[in-house]
UniProtKB/Swiss-Prot annotation:
It holds the Pfam family Ribosomal_L23. The keyword Transport does not apply. This is Large ribosomal subunit protein uL23. Keywords: Ribonucleoprotein, Ribosomal protein, RNA-binding, rRNA-binding. Residues 1-24 are annotated as: Disordered. One of its GO terms (cellular component) is ribonucleoprotein complex. One of its GO terms (molecular function) is rRNA binding. SUPFAM superfamilies: Ribosomal proteins S24e, L23 and L15e. Belongs to the universal ribosomal protein uL23 family. NCBIfam families: PRK14548.1. Residues 7-18 have a biased composition (Low complexity). The gene is RPL23A.
């Protein structure tokens, strides 16, 4: 027996002695007697989404929403025209993921008017409408004329 084999044999003997002292542990299967079934835990893989599901994070990361893509097209229905005449409010289709502050700043920059408030409405067809109420010093009819609605 050379020195390497001797050290291997000693290590093997020590491990065997350790196991003999500790005892071999056999886990007995527990018998469940309850009526409720607990679904076994399965492997949960780490998620790697293609894009963020939160609106603000998505818009900040991509940064593709400029003023022209936030405010899309004006609405020229009778209801929208009545709002324009009576309440000094313009109605526009806007980007689905845009927020009220984004709509307000984009509208002010595009048309050089002051906006008092913005109300939004998600339609059944999947579009988003913005009811943009102009400030008292701005007139919606003048703006509509300038855009070419009237």
């Amino acid at each position: 027996m050379n020195k390497e084999n001797k050290t291997q044999a000693v290590n093997k003997a020590k491990n065997t002695a350790k196991v003999a002292k500790k005892g071999s542990s056999i886990t007995k299967h527990k018998t469940y007697t309850g009526v409720r079934f607990f679904r076994p835990k399965t492997l949960q893989l780490a998620k790697a989404p293609k894009y963020s599901r939160t609106v603000r994070a998505h818009l900040k990361v991509s940064g593709h929403l400029d003023n022209h893509s936030v405010v899309k097209t004006p609405l020229t229905t009778e209801k929208a025209m009545k709002k324009m005449e009576d309440e000094n409010t313009m109605v526009f289709y806007v980007h689905n993921r845009s927020t009220k502050p984004q709509i307000k700043s984009a509208f002010e920059k595009l048309y050089n008017v002051k906006v008092r408030s913005v109300n939004t409405l998600n339609t059944i067809t999947g579009n988003k409408k913005a009811y943009i109420r102009l400030a008292a010093d701005s007139d919606s009819l003048t703006l509509a004329n300038k855009i070419g609605l009237i």
